[in-house]
């Protein structure tokens, strides 16, 4: 039964902290059923709108970095927080979603069917979560209702999950594992509804509040540069994180070995003067003593000594399939595409892991990239792989080499 959302203050309580979360795990282990169960159980408390399996499973397409991904976003609240929850129908959609950062997860709910235990995609999703920087996950051990009287087997599955999490550097010993039945909760059985509420309590307490981008060091990617006669050089772009005030010192980073120091002497947005530019703003900043030739699109303006340009790094990449607009053929070790970071692309070469000869469209692989010019990147930076102006892959920097 759908519960009508009451239009009280509670629904749009801005004082609740916002967290992005998602369900991950092997195919048919119950991710979408659990997503439906969470919304349905919380709807009974007036904290969500009940969603059934079919409406979540018919996930709309969205594009991120030129890649089509089927993702279902639903929202719900607990007494403490407001959540945006992403669930993907297909395995390839999970990989694309995580690598492109279409939904940056602050934490994840790993769903494992107790009847099967961890399976190949369970491992792959845990590894991907580690690579793209998901800090913590809570485990829902599903389908417990099918294993009545088999307590020992369930205990063994739990041990296996904890060992698996620890092997990928998650805190396997302390990760909450909730035993339940998503289907039972969706059918309104009180003992299983209680388990969904227990799961959400664990998510509330174990998934840490993310450091909001406002608290991080200032960084703005340069999109455009122009000169104002008599005043100097202005760079425009979107502030990716942090904030900057008038007369603060910053560095221009990228393309050159050494950053250029300068001071911000003016900040404008929509032709209005500002004292501060902050994360999310599309702003223009006036830079003291900077010639037009000293700065270009693709560089970043950042708080001094907080980001350095690099040319070589390891990355997790997804190669688009032909049907997704990707290549029709594999690529080999001499492949030199463009790597698109923030506002610009730079040519680079690739090295495969030992034993790999090629990458076939649809593959999800780890490789090493070496760019022809240094770019401001760090662990977790997202990029697209392009050739001839079209996107053929997406990646996340997993480790800086030089």
Swiss-Prot record:
Which Gene3D superfamilies does the entry mention?
P-loop containing nucleotide triphosphate hydrolases (3.40.50.300), Translation factors (2.40.30.10)
EC number(s) per UniProt? 3.6.5.3
Cleaved signal peptide residues: none
Annotated compartments = Cytoplasm
Q: Which CDD domains match?
A: EF_Tu, EFTU_II, EFTU_III
Identify the residues that bind GTP: 25-32, 87-91, 142-145
Q: What protein is this chain from? A: Elongation factor Tu
Organism name: Mesomycoplasma hyopneumoniae (strain 7448) (Mycoplasma hyopneumoniae)
């Amino acid at each position: 039964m759908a519960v009508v959302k009451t239009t009280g203050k509670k629904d749009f309580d801005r004082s609740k902290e916002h967290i992005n979360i998602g369900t991950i795990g092997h195919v048919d282990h119950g991710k979408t059923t659990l997503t439906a169960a969470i919304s349905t159980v919380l709807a009974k408390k007036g904290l969500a709108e009940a969603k059934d399996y079919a409406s979540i499973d018919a996930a709309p397409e969205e594009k991120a970095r030129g890649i089509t991904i089927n993702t279902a976003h639903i929202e719900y609240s607990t007494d403490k927080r407001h959540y945006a929850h992403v669930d993907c129908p297909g395995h390839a959609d999970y990989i694309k979603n995580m690598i492109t950062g279409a939904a940056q997860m602050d934490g994840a709910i790993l769903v494992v069917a107790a009847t099967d235990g961890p399976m190949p995609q369970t491992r792959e999703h845990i590894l991907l979560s580690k690579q793209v920087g998901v800090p913590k996950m809570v485990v829902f051990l599903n389908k417990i209702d099918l294993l009545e009287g088999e307590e020992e087997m369930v205990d063994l599955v739990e041990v296996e999950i904890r060992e698996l999490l620890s092997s990928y550097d998650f805190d396997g010993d302390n990760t909450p594992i909730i035993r339940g039945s998503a289907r039972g909760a969706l059918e309104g059985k009180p003992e299983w509804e209680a388990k969904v509420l227990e799961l959400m309590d664990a998510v509330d307490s174990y998934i840490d509040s993310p450091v909001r981008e406002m608290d991080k060091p200032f960084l703005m990617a340069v999109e455009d540069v122009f000169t104002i006669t008599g005043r100097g050089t202005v760079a425009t772009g979107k502030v990716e994180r942090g904030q900057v005030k008038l007369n603060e010192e910053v560095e221009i980073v990228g393309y050159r070995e050494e950053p250029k120091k300068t001071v911000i002497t003016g900040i404008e947005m929509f032709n209005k003067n500002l004292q501060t530019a902050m994360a999310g703003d599309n702003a223009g900043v006036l830079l003291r003593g900077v010639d037009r030739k000293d700065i270009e699109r693709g560089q970043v303006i950042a708080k001094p000594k907080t980001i350095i340009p690099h040319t070589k790094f390891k990355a997790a990449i997804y190669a688009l399939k032909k049907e997704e607009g990707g290549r029709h053929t594999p690529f080999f070790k001499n492949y030199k595409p463009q790597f698109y970071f923030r506002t610009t692309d730079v040519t680079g070469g690739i090295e495969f892991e030992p034993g790999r000869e090629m990458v076939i469209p649809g593959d999800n692989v780890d490789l090493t990239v070496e760019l022809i010019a240094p770019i401001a990147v760090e662990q977790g930076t997202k990029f697209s792989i392009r050739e001839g102006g079209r996107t053929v892959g997406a990646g996340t920097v997993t480790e800086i080499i030089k």
